[in-house]
């Protein structure tokens, strides 16, 4: 598992709304059975979810997705789907979004 990799969401009840999950957990905690993820929603499906600093927009396979940072959650590693992208190039955007969510700064 690597921080800032994007996985397919395999959960039957959420995968249609949030097809991708962004792993934001540090690699130093790979020994845990869980990973912290941010759901990615297709930008076209979102009406009012966009807040520039809190919900950065990224592109995966030619499609734009909104990172729904306020919906941060934990998931068992075994439930993560295959890796489809690496968004480490957007690291600063995700760290800033998490910082804003947790500290308001």
Segments and roles (model prediction):
Residues 12, 49, 85-89:
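Residue-level detector of secondary-structure boundary/capping sites
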Residues 1, 15, 88-92:
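A generic "functional-site adjacency" signal
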Residues 58-105:
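C-terminal terminal-subdomain/extension
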Residues 13, 43-44, 64, 73:
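Residues that cap or initiate secondary-structure elements
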